[in-house]
Structures are given as C-alpha cells and as structure tokens.
Amino acid sequence: SARDFLRQECPTTHVRAMEEDLTGYSPELWQKMTELGWAGLMFPEQYGGSGYTFVELCVLLEEYGRSLLPSPFHATVLTFGLPILFGGSAAQKAHYLPAIAEGKHLGTLALTEPSASFEPSGVHVRAVAHNGGFVIDGTKLFVTNAHTADTLLVAVRSSDAGGPADGISLLLVPGNAPGVAQ
C-alpha cells in the first residue's frame, strides 16, 4: 500500500534531510514513486498513466500528507500535468504526460505575482505575440520547485478584452529559457 511504502521509504529523518537539501526532494525516491505509477495515476493509459479518478488521487494525497513527503508530485502532477491533461492540445498531452508518468519531466505552475492575489484580476504579467511565439514581461514569485522544473506553465495576460477573468493564457516555458531567473 502507499502507506506502507511511504512509512518504509520516507521516515521522518529522511523527510528532514530532504528539506535541508537544495533540491528539496530525493530524486531516487521520486523515481521509485513513478515506477509505482503514482505520477501518472490520473493520466489516461494512452499517455502512460493508470486512468484513475480524483478519488484515488485523494487517497494517495492523504498518505503523502501523513508522511509529510517533500516531492515534485504537487508541482509536476497537480499544477502542471493536470492542466495539460484537461486543457492542453493533443500534441502537448502526447509530449508531456508520458514523460511525467515515467518521472522524466518535471514541471510547475507559475501563478503568483508581487500582488500575491490569486484572483484572475491579479494576473498582470503580459505576453505579447512575437515571431511565432510570445514575449513575456513581468515577475512571478513563489513558484514551487521552479529550481528543478524542466518546464514552467506560466499564467499570463494575453489580452485586455472582456472582464478581469478574460484574456488569461497558460504558456509553456522551458525552465532554462532566456529571462527565466530562479
């Protein structure tokens, strides 16, 4: 069971050591967890996942919480992978989801800005179309696991049309892209 695995692999002393480490988690333990299928728990089988539901995800998260496990699961699976699953293109799903399920790709959501507002009106970072891509201008703060993420899912304001919840886009940005500072 998840509880038995975490009790054995993630004792309190191990958790404290991971918290002191600059990476913030154990890559070896993360790989074991992905081999158990946890990173792809909710992804469809066609993307290397198990095809389970939010119920199974919640059970697993309860056990994570019980063990105080520091890992890239929340950032990579919940705030990066699930938005791609539910809103990404077919090509994005095919590219990112199998790599996440296999433990070969880490991602995170860059949402918080200096205003610290989680409301749509708090998204001020701008994205302007340029040469087939976008130029992003602004600052994101408190981006969980940004220092280890291969890709950031960045919430930006791409249009001023409509109300404050309109004109917001999520852009995939390589973690090593020019201008990305961690």
Residue ranges and their predicted role:
Residues 103-112:
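A short, Trp-centered hydrophobic/proline-enriched beta-strand micro-motif
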